[in-house]
Amino acid sequence: MGIDHTSKQHKRSGHRTAPKSDNVYLKLLVKLYTFLARRTDAPFNKVVLKALFLSKINRPPVSVSRIARALKQEGAANKTVVVVGTVTDDARIFEFPKTTVAALRFTAGARAKIVKAGGECITLDQLAVRAPKGQNTLILRGPRNSREAVRHFGMGPHKGKAPRILSTGRKFERARGRRRSKGFKV
């Protein structure tokens, strides 16, 4: 009699231990923050390191309007904003507070808006020199679930998820169960 292997014997951990990318600058940042995460007791460095491992989809961009909104919070006005990802411009805002923003990259419009307000744009390795323990910083993340693809995930009855279809219109995906005139409507 043998043993029934009812579950997978070698379970892969879903967590990344290194970035998938071959970007040498990213690898240098990983090396730097691996050292800081090990040698300092600050959880900030561990958070930044884990964020550096993420895929581009899981590192959505942060707009300058989101940064401006975050800085309006109580006690956040003079903190350094940290974004492990891209900082993008927002044409809808004209007033931007003077602040220091550290990020992986900036779009030209976002950089211009931050500098014009009297702030500065720094890289994450410059941040490590200024705040090795992440003191006086504010970490921001972009919206992960704003992608169009997320509308289709978890399809099923009563989930309100969008079906994957090529044609859209009044009668597409609106038959039995979706219209009163076709049997019933949920």
UniProtKB/Swiss-Prot annotation:
GO terms for molecular function: RNA binding; structural constituent of ribosome. GO terms for cellular component: cytosol; cytosolic large ribosomal subunit. Keywords: Cytoplasm, Isopeptide bond, Methylation, Ribonucleoprotein, Ribosomal protein, Ubl conjugation. The modification N6,N6,N6-trimethyllysine is found at residue 50. The keyword Cytoplasm applies. The keyword Ubl conjugation applies. There are 2 genes for eL18 in yeast. Belongs to the eukaryotic ribosomal protein eL18 family. Component of the ribosome, a large ribonucleoprotein complex responsible for the synthesis of proteins in the cell. The small ribosomal subunit (SSU) binds messenger RNAs (mRNAs) and translates the encoded message by selecting cognate aminoacyl-transfer RNA (tRNA) molecules. The large subunit (LSU) contains the ribosomal catalytic site termed the peptidyl transferase center (PTC), which catalyzes the formation of peptide bonds, thereby polymerizing the amino acids delivered by tRNAs into a polypeptide chain. This is Large ribosomal subunit protein eL18A. It comes from Saccharomyces cerevisiae (strain ATCC 204508 / S288c). The lineage of its organism: Eukaryota, Fungi, Dikarya, Ascomycota, Saccharomycotina.
